[in-house]
Amino acid sequence: MSFRPIKEKKSAQPFIEGAGVSLFRAFGFRDPEECDPFLMLDDFRNDDPEKFKAGFPWHPHRGIETITYVLDGTIEHQDSLGNKGILSGGDVQWMTAGSGILHQEMPLGNAKGQMHGFQLWANLPGSQKMVNPRYQDVSHSDIPLLEEDDGSKIKVVVGGYKGVNGPVDGIAADPQYFDVYVPPNTKKEISVDAYRNCFAYIFQGSANFAYSSKPMGVRIEKELNGEELNIRDLSGNRTLIRFDSGDSISLYSGENGVRFLLVSGKPIQEPVAWHGPIVMNTREELTQAFSDLRNGTFIKPLH
């Protein structure tokens, strides 16, 4: 087994999006290759309705897929295909924008005025950028939860883990998307296919994802099963960790445990032309998309 070392660790940055929604961006709009095939991850977590209720009014997308995962609160959505609905805590929505879609997402929060969820953008390869748009809404009750002997809990949102498959399928990036909880002071190893790019996003508690590489020149603070363990630098809330190559990730959770998203996907390795909500392969395709918007031809006939 080859553990994935950390390639990069950074904190999510505050952003204002939509009509004035305060959120934290883990990555996106900097280097489209850094998490290929994924383009962006937003953490929309807020206890003040004034900072999210303006929402994300009608806007276009082309050339991408989005995966929205709601932890708490509700989101009302509708689109140019005539779909309409409400996502509640634990629900997931996958949208393939393909050739073009207009939609809006309006966070409503919970009874206490709180809202928390994530939206991940995945790129589409050039051969699929103009496919028909489509939606898939998945109820929290349909998302399998694995409870392991060490007390860990893994929700399999997309992809498969230990023979259990998540309900969301058909995404071009062939992702694995897990919501992972590891109890306090626990060593955990999770397999990730070696051909995938992989990242973790911590949103509760803390953990050390780097100890397995046995870094030199740092203070050793603990011992686990006879192994020296470096826990000097725990990664905590709103931390993104990008992993290098290997076939598994390894961590040791902090005194309050840790909860994080673990996401991986097969890199597309194609040119990216990206502006706002539209992602194509060339500048010419991008220019055409915005011309279609201006001319009223953005929404294509289904085929």
Predicted segments — roles?
Residues 1-303:
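Jelly-roll (double-stranded beta-helix
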